[in-house]
């Protein structure tokens, strides 16, 4: 039986908040969690540095990032695809 292997790498979707570094974008991923005592839904966010080889992702784009081997001290993710282009203001 040949079954497709399920990828063990995590994927997240977030918004590019910085594209100033060479070949790197900073992606903010927001998630909703319920407060354990007050039962209020809160939004928590985390920032990840992701590798962007061609420099194709710009500020405000929504991108998908995939976990990878460590590429530098803080960079363990790779930007894999563009989900939504940033709207022009």
Curated annotation (Swiss-Prot):
One of its GO terms (molecular function) is rRNA binding. The keyword Ribosomal protein applies. Keywords: Ribonucleoprotein, Ribosomal protein, RNA-binding, rRNA-binding. It holds the Pfam family Ribosomal_S17. One of its GO terms (cellular component) is cytosolic small ribosomal subunit. GO terms for biological process: translation. Belongs to the universal ribosomal protein uS17 family. Part of the 30S ribosomal subunit. This is Small ribosomal subunit protein uS17. The gene is rpsQ.
